[in-house]
UniProtKB/Swiss-Prot annotation:
Belongs to the peroxidase family. Peroxidase/catalase subfamily. It comes from the Bacteria. The active site is at residue 92. SUPFAM superfamilies: Heme-dependent peroxidases (SSF48113). Formation of the three residue Trp-Tyr-Met cross-link is important for the catalase, but not the peroxidase activity of the enzyme. The record marks 88 as: Transition state stabilizer. PROSITE patterns: PEROXIDASE_1 (PS00435), PEROXIDASE_2 (PS00436), PEROXIDASE_4 (PS50873). This is Catalase-peroxidase.
Amino acid sequence: MSNEAKCPFNHTAGSGTSNRDWWPKQLRVDLLAQHSSKSNPMGEDFDYAEAFKSLDLAAVKADLAKVMTDSQDWWPADFGHYGPLFVRMAWHSAGTYRIGDGRGGAGRGQQRFAPLNSWPDNVNLDKARRLLWPVKQKYGNKISWADLLILTGNVALETMGFKTFGFAGGRADVWEPDLDVYWGTESTWLGGDDRYGKGKGSSSQGEIPADAHRHGQEQARTAPAGRNLENPLAAVQMGLIYVNPEGPEGNPDPLAAAHDIRETFARMAMDDEETVALIAGGHTFGKTHGAGDAKHVGREPEGEDMDSQGLGWKSSFGSGVGGDTISSGLEVTWTQTPAQWSNYFFENLFKYEWELTKSPAGAHQWVAKGADAVIPHAHGGAPLLPTMLTTDLSLRFDPAYEKISRRFLEHPEQFADAFARAWFKLTHRDLGPRSRYLGPEVPAEELIWQDPLPQAEGAQIDAADVAALKAKVLGSGLSVPELVATAWASASTFRGGDMRGGANGARIRLAPQKDWAANQPAQLAKVLKTLEGIQSAFNQGGKKVSLADLIVLAGSAAVEKAAQDAGVAVAVPFRAGRVDASQEQTDAASFAPLEPIVDGFRNFQKQRYAVRGEDMLIDKAQQLTLSAPEMTVLVGGLRVLGNNVGGSTKGMFTDRVGVLSNDFFVNLLDMATEWKSTSPAQEEFEGRDRKTGAVKWAGTRVDLVFGSNAVLRALAEVYASADAKEKFVKDFVAAWVKVMELDRFDLK
């Protein structure tokens, strides 16, 4: 008998058949417990922003500059410079961002973890991060991996002769993979059938349907048949950052590839000019790697053996490194100076006619007809012919891209400026507003995609002012539901993925938010008109209150009144300091994806979707950075406060709407009530008296899940208990204030 067989332990913690094995559609309440203090080795007192402020950024950059040309035998630098590798590393760290849901991106250093550390498109970037370890080790916790990856990309560009637009730190690391990001449902790497619905543009598995976001809608209307990419995905195949460089599904058609490029880059919030600049700028440097057949390449890092120590993609082709490297399978070097900024990309793109060929690994690529061998070999071999990818040729043959490309060819200074700005946007898009930017290289120029805010002016309102304003609001004739709904609508646009949205700026009074269906435009206009009157009268006295502050203050006053009416005296904490943005500071197209097409906290769905309402509630709660208890108490409180959209009474399990009671939980869990579905899809339900059969309540999946899901029921029972009256109010107020202050980075 082997030693293994003699082991007295035949199980370990977490092994065996899991709950999700038995019930694959089980609600993922666990998504609300990510990145807790239990996974963070730094402790609750660690303040990354303060640590970063003590960093000598110039010294870090000097050390990074040395790394660029310090070629290591275990992974030799192409052209004697690691710059191109680090540009790709930084790009792929940031390039997972998508504007549709604000997830992905560079902000948490997720490239270190699965699945990103093992994506086919990230092949051999494990080596790039290992090259950086001595620098990370030296500066320790003063610079996060998330910041270091982006800073290294900037230093790479600068050491290759390019002037960058700037750099901002502030990306705090997390210590485990993000579990909430929807990357698609394909079960094979580089699969794309599900996201294109096998030719039908299906959206049944995503968070939202394919027509839910307006960003890039024009391109979607002209998509080739069956080429409608599921939202919010921004990559054409599982494990790619954007597009297949060989062309759609390997078809080397530059025009077809242009559609995929335009759609995926638009979903990362890039327009045509930014797209051209990024592709051409990135491909000014370095090369792709396809020295031999991919069969020589081993497993990705997550699938490798322990002695590989987190490295993957070992190659048995030749030396496996240097000139024998296999990464993408393509073997393309774009310019005559791959480690130096130039305009050679556009010069070569338009100078030559291009002939389809294949790389040594068998991948489709293009070679210049009749050209001289002017391209240097990465490791000292004979010069090479100019080569391009199918997606590079898209910049010449797509009419819109071609116009921009020719302008950049003729005006290199415009190209350099466009690339600098697009690179900064790419690497900072998910960092949030400028108030989160740290370090001496933050650019002074304010950019529209940063959702700019004006500076606060004058003294902030004090406690006496707050009390006076609350009295004015409560005496204005506006109801508790109206005030609560307006404050919630203003604050709950916040997305933890990219730190956008929230109450600061009072953009709820501007396009597009003032017209969103979830915000009940007619009611909203009425409330805002009344609040603006109160604001105007108050501001006559010398001190100023912003409408952004007043909206939140009014909602908080309503919560206090509702609690008092329930017999609980409570003061809702309020901190002034919000400002009012202008329409000129608000890019309506950029804000369109923030529209709540579903909001379980308001029992609102703009239309019926294939995704279950309770799953979308979890999604919304996760964006609001809520825990499961916070989500639970907010739903229960907002229902009895009348926060539903359009006069719906579903889920309002109370006969005293506007009173902050625990009635929602008490009545939901009442065994005298029997619930039955009233729709074939089990979307809506009636609660009937078990004895008389009389209808008592009506609810939706988002309501009944707090009784049907075991985890949520356990939480609901806490708030339904006889001794929970004060705890319920206290917990609701804490969660309410959290949401109201999610975008108050000036307080954190």
